[in-house]
Each structure stands twice: as structure tokens, then as C-alpha cells.
UniProtKB/Swiss-Prot annotation:
Sequence similarity: Belongs to the ATPase alpha/beta chains family.
Principal location listed in the UniProt entry: membrane
Subcellular location: Cell inner membrane
Function: Produces ATP from ADP in the presence of a proton gradient across the membrane. The alpha chain is a regulatory subunit.
Catalytic activity: ATP + H2O + 4 H(+)(in) = ADP + phosphate + 5 H(+)(out)
Any GO BP: ATP biosynthetic process
Gene expressing this chain: atpA
GO molecular function, one term: proton-transporting ATP synthase activity, rotational mechanism
One GO term describing the cellular component: plasma membrane
Name of the protein: ATP synthase subunit alpha
Membrane topology: Peripheral membrane protein
EC code(s) of this entry: 7.1.2.2
InterPro entries: ATP_synth_asu-like_sf, ATP_synth_asu_C, ATP_synth_asu_C_sf, ATP_synth_F1_a_nt-bd_dom, ATP_synth_F1_asu, ATPase_a/bsu_AS, ATPase_F1/V1/A1_a/bsu_N, ATPase_F1/V1/A1_a/bsu_N_sf
Amino acid sequence: MEIRAAEISAILKEQIANFGTEAESAEVGQVLSVGDGIARVYGLDNVQAGEMVEFANGVKGMALNLESDNVGIVIFGEDRGIKEGDVVKRTQTIVDVPVGKGLLGRVVDGLGNPIDGKGDLVDVERKRAEVKAPGIIPRKSVHEPVQTGIKAIDSLIPIGRGQRELIIGDRQTGKTAVILDTILNQKAVNDKAKDDSEKLFCVYVAVGQKRSTVAQVVKVLADHGALDYTIVVAATASEPAPLQFLAPYTGCTMGEFFRDNGMHAVIFYDDLTKQAVAYRQMSLLLRRPPGREAFPGDVFYLHSRLLERAAKLNDDNGAGSLTALPVIETQANDVSAYIPTNVISITDGQIFLETDLFFKGIRPAVNVGLSVSRVGSSAQIKAMKQVAGSIKLELAQYREMAAFAQFASDLDPATQKLLARGARLTELLKQAQYSPLAVEEQVCVIYAGTRGYLDKLKTTDVVRYEASLLGALRTSGADLLESIRTGKALSKEIEQKLVKFLDDFGKKFA
């Protein structure tokens, strides 16, 4: 075979002409030390605070401490595969996560990667995990209700769309149960909705919980058909502290997608105590100076910048909303500890759950005296306002009298009546788990309580009376429920119908 010099030179010229000159440039650094989920890196001179970096083995990290001679990086994963001298690359992107409707029904980790084995995410875009909260001008005051389906909350501590309402209590007082009931209660509304702007989407963020607990929550949601409108973000106890720190921001960004596109979402952070503990661990390992209870000085800002992102937007901005229900776990009912007081001061009210009430069988164990909703009353529907107005006062008087009555032997009839009414109302506010009630059913039940229909009954019969009443309402009183649902207020005509219905029912009930 003859080799022609001209041909060789032609081939070489062609290859040189097509040679890509764009060399890949990546700013790199070297690991100085690594341990406890923190890496100290030399180099990376132009790295930004909060920027995602990549280690040689593919594990990602986030630059948090930018010091004169090194960079402190928290590692989103196992630090075992990283060693001294390894190369670290800048990605030149601030930490971002997937958002969109493709996440509904999925379980993802703190970075938004799916962990439910259902394959890759589809129909998603990417947004930064940390963004500024909306300012004052785009907002509107809270005026639409979020129905939890729990009588004690919807009547006494109403929650509005765009509100931040704290759920606070010791371990095992039913905090997650309140969240689950709220999610399940949206099913009826969402099934009837004509379009997405009428639905209420849910985002559940589990921080530092056992995997078995998260699996149980997902199973309950799936069994009740509630996963279709829910996103679960799970950073469990076995995951590194940086992922537990990031998970609430990840979930919030996912919820903001609905808020910014004229839809409504509610996000549950379960719980922020564990996020603060994870942040404390990271901060101490990064050698940031500790403050009260060894938390870093900016732990207030950690929670305030997260919760300020919940908002009700005005009509010019799409009228969407993001409601936040953070959870805080207290130790021995100590609401005056550092993190609880911080979060109470950031939120628009709190639902206080008590161990004593829980063990007395009052479940949900809501302490009506200490719980408050600072903006929710303007979101409550008129019918509920009309029937529940007196219940708070009557329960407060009952608690005051009950303490006093323990010492007094003979009580006048008025006091006895007050105590009897209070005991029946307390009984009426009890509710089984996973059985949320529609607001029109709550209105009828509470009307029966506040207008004296329970006074003739034994306290032990109240629960049975309520169950029978609800059964009767759903069968023979369906038109009455429909008129309350559509009218959203008790007109004279509807009230007369309700009184007649309760009178007739009272005669049959025995």
C-alpha cells in the first residue's frame, strides 16, 4: 500500500481545523482535613457562600465558612470516601432543588433526589433552595381559611392561608397526628376542585425522624389517597446534619412553586427543633462562636428566613399562598427555652399540645387556654364564627371554676350548670385520629354543644350523640349541610332548619 504525503497532510489539516479549542476550566481546591461531615479546603479563592462544590468521589458539599486561608465545607453525604489531598471542584451554582407538579406523590431527600424507588422525576424545573421572602408590597392580609378538619382547631384556633401557625408540645403528644389529619382533610376539597387554584397542595418535611416513622406517614397518606397532592421531603436521623439543615429550605422552595403560580400550598416542618440541633452541630464543627444553649448567634435568622417565605400574595401577583405549620418539640412543657421562644415570636400563633391532657384522654390534646391564632379569625368562615364565638369563653370559665370547685363543697346552681356545660364541651372537642370533619359538619356539632342540646345528656354519652348526629346529618340532613357549605353563614332560615333538625333528632336519640 502506497502512502501519499499529500493525503496525510490533508487529513492532519482537517483534524487540526476541527479540533475543539475550548479547554474545560474548573477552579479546584485541595482537602486539608476532613471529619464529622466537615471538610477544610485550600484554594477555591472565588467560591461563593452557599455554593455547591463537588468532591473527587462525586459527593456534593456546600461552602459555608469563607476564611482568609481556607474554606469550610459541609458535606451532603458520607465523608468516609474523602481524604486529605483530594481535589474539590466548584460547580458555580448556588444549591438548587427540583420544583414542579412532577414532585406530587413522591418522596425525596434533602436535596430533592427521589428515594421512593419510582424512577426519575419528570415535569420539574430547578430553583434555588435559599431565596428572599416576598416583600411587604406583594403581600395581602390573610383572609381565606385552611380547614384542618379538627374541631378544636377550626373553631378555636383557626388557620388562614398564608399564616404561620406553630404546633408545639412534648414528644408523643400528637403533633404529627394533627399534621396528618390536616393533610387528609384536604382530600374532599381537592377532589371537588375544578382547577388547581382551588386545591390545597401539601408539603411534608420530616427532619431528623426515624425512617420507620416516615415510612408509616407515607403509608397512611397512600392508604387514604392523599399522596396525589402531597410532596414528602425526608432527611431522616441517619442522614448527615447538613441535609437535615437543608431539608426545610428544600421543601419551602417546592411549596413556593405553587404560591408563585397562583395556587395554594401548606407546608409542615416536622420538626424545627431537630433542624436547629443539626445547625448547631455544623456551626460548632465549623468553629463558629456558640451562644445561648450552645446554639450559634444566627439561629433566630435560621428560622425567621425560612418562615417569612410563607405568605399570601395579592391579586397582582397571582393571589397564591403558602401556609407554614412548623413543629417544635419541647422538653417537659418548657415553652420558655431558646428555640421555642424564638419560633413563637416568629409565627402568627401557636397550637399548644399538652402531655397531661393527652393522658387524660383529651385528644387532640390542645390546651385551649395557651393556644392562640393571631390572624386566623379573619379567615374563619362566618358560620363557624357564629357558633364558636361563645365556646372559648365558656371553656375558659369552666377551667377557672373547675380549679375552684375542687375546694368548694356546695356549689350554687349557676356554677353547677357552668361546670356541666364545660365538661360536655370538652368531651365534644375530642376527635379520633384520621377522621377529619368537613366544616359544615363541625358547625352543626358545635351548634348543638353551645345551644344546650348536650346539657341533658350524660357526659359519657356525648361522643355517641355526636356520632349519631353526624350519621343523621349525612343521610337525612344532606341539604342542610349543603346550604351551610355554600352559604358559609347561618342565616335565620338555615338556623331554624338546624334547630328543628336537632329537636327532632333529640327526641329519637336515646
